[in-house]
């Protein structure tokens, strides 16, 4: 058998693995690249296989970096089953059409501008019809149910504890007299997350394809509820708003769960709470109607509140654009949860535009922020940022609450793997920025005494039973991380020219500052030299 790595290589997004077993081909995940414009442009590239030859897709969970290119796959000829859990199908039924609307809107906008310039018509990456046709191919499988994907390949979904419906994949492959056991982790969640169950214990495998999103980090053990309460109380005292860019699926529901608990305990005031995202509204409804996936605490609360997981009189779900716009006209402090979680699109941009300049407001990030996104730039301390074409001064307090991550950290992943009965022959380590993948791979090798490999895009693992060898890709493709670095450095060049002009004006008006400015610039120059020496 062969496994070709066609996404999430040395980056976090775009998960896609092509498996070839004899004459049969199928995929595990088919996700979108997310982040900067240059990284998202990778979605436009042709698949490195013919979609019509793919017999099936095994989908680990609904997040679009794992599911988002399924409509494109169908558009280009795929007609096989897409296997997933019930909740994953329900969540994809809102996520995929939403992505299609975005693609259609971006194409329409590009064509309006392009027609005036005489440019070629731009086709959307995929349409709402493509998303609908993809959803009709979904085949539901329960956790713990073994099923055949193609001849000789059996798959079982196990609880991954990442989001509702998320699964890691246990796979058994029989080729002649050779048998291979594989695990594809998808995304593994933190233990003790609210609402959903912890990741199930895996029995072991010959080879594991592991995520590494937080492979170089340890989640801080601290009182998340307490910090959230402090942020809200401090902001209300200042008279501002709490704006939370949050993933519509998973994070929004966890935040509501915490707010309900804090209010019930009298730790935060009962100010208006707005969920301003049609997708988050529907995802919350899906979460409320799947109690079979709740953990013990959530099940008890659900029963106690009359089959309602979240019940707050001050909670508002906005549907229309008019309702969304009206939020910023309402006096008094409020909490606004809106998508997207990385602040790179959606209604959250309007709320950032209205609140970033305000010293009394707070912006709270409670999730991973990919390279190149507005969220990443804000948590890294940028002082001015362009939102919806407007240059905005960042005066609001910016908080980065890392403990809310739905991804296991390095220690949690190591503990999960150490609990397995058998050590695999090798770990393949995609789904992480290079520094995270490298640190996790090193830790796995040292702690478990097993081989590790961090794939490049297009690399292929050839496996016979428990023997394996890598075939490095001959394709020339710049890694997403390198693409993003190039874009970042272009931004640095623009910033340098702006700063140079400002410095020259300051010194022209205040010649006595020239010596001080030169000394500081010399320090900066030396610092840049030191960086290059370290490389």
Where are the model-predicted features located?
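Binuclear metal-ion centers of metallo-dependent hydrolases, dominated by the metallo-beta-lactamase
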Residues: 219-301, 423-479
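Metallo-beta-lactamase
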Residues: 99-163, 291-330
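Active-site neighborhood of phospho(di)ester-bond hydrolases with catalytic His/Asp-centered motifs
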Residues: 28-30, 54-63, 70, 82-85, ...
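Short, surface-exposed connector motifs at secondary-structure boundaries
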Residues: 52-54, 76-79, 234-243, 269, ...
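Pre-active-site segment of Zn-dependent metallo-hydrolases
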Residues: 9-11, 21-80, 84-134, 188-197, ...
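Active-site-proximal loop/helix segments of hydrolase catalytic cores
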Residues: 161-166, 173-175, 179-205, 212, ...
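Core dinuclear metal-dependent hydrolase active-site scaffold
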Residues: 1-52, 133-197, 322, 326-329, ...
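C-terminal regulatory/interaction regions
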Residues: 261-264, 311-535
């Amino acid at each position: 058998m062969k496994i070709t790595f066609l996404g999430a290589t040395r980056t976090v997004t775009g998960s896609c693995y092509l498996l070839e077993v004899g004459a049969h081909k199928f995929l595990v995940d088919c996700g979108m690249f997310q982040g900067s414009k240059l990284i998202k442009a990778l979605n436009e590239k042709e698949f490195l296989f013919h979609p019509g030859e793919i017999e099936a897709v095994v989908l680990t969970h609904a997040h679009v970096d794992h599911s988002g290119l399924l409509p494109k796959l169908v558009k280009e000829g795929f007609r096989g089953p897409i296997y997933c859990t019930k909740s994953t199908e329900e969540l994809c039924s809102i996520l995929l059409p939403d992505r299609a609307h975005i693609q259609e809107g971006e194409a329409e906008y590009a064509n309006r501008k392009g027609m005036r310039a005489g440019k070629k018509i731009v086709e959307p990456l995929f349409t709402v019809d493509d998303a609908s046709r993809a959803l009709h191919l979904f085949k539901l499988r329960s956790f713990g149910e073994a099923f055949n994907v193609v001849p000789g390949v059996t798959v079982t979904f196990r609880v991954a504890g990442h989001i509702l419906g998320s699964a890691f994949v246990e796979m058994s492959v029989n080729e002649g007299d050779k048998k291979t056991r594989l695990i594809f982790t998808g995304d593994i969640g933190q233990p003790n997350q609210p609402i959903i169950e912890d990741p199930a214990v895996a029995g072991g495998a010959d080879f594991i394809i592991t995520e590494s999103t937080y492979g170089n980090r340890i989640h801080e053990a601290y009182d998340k509820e307490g910090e959230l309460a402090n942020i809200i109380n401090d902001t209300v005292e200042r008279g501002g708003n709490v704006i939370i860019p949050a993933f519509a699926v998973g994070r929004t529901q966890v935040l509501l769960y915490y707010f309900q608990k804090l209010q019930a305990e009298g730790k935060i005031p009962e100010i208006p709470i707005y969920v301003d995202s049609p997708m988050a509204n529907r995802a919350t409804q899906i979460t409320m109607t799947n109690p079979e996936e709740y953990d013990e605490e959530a099940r008890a609360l659900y029963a106690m509140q009359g089959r309602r997981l979240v019940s707050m009189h001050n909670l508002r779900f906005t549907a229309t654009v008019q309702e969304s716009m009206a939020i910023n006209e309402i006096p008094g402090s409020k909490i606004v949860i809106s998508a997207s979680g990385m602040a790179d699109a959606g209604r959250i941009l309007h709320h950032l535009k209205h609140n970033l300049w305000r010293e009394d407001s707070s912006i709270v990030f409670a999730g991973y922020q990919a390279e190149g996104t507005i969220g990443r730039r804000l948590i890294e301390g940028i002082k001015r940022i362009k939102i919806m074409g407007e240059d905005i001064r960042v005066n609001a307090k910016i908080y980065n609450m890392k403990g809310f991550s739905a991804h296991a950290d390095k220690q949690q992943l190591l503990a999960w793997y150490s609990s397995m009965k058998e050590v695999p022959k090798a770990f393949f380590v995609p789904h992480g920025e290079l520094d995270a993948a490298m640190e996790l791979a090193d830790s796995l090798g040292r702690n478990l005494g097993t081989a590790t490999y961090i794939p490049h895009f297009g690399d292929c693992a050839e496996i016979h039973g428990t023997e394996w060898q890598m075939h490095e890709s001959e394709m020339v493709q710049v890694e997403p991380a390198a693409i993003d670095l190039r874009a970042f450095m272009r931004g640095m060049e623009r910033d340098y020219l702006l700063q140079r002009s400002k410095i020259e004006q300051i010194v022209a008006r205040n010649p006595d500052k020239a010596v001080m400015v030169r000394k500081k610039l010399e320090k900066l120059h030396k610092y840049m030299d030191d960086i290059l020496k370290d490389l």
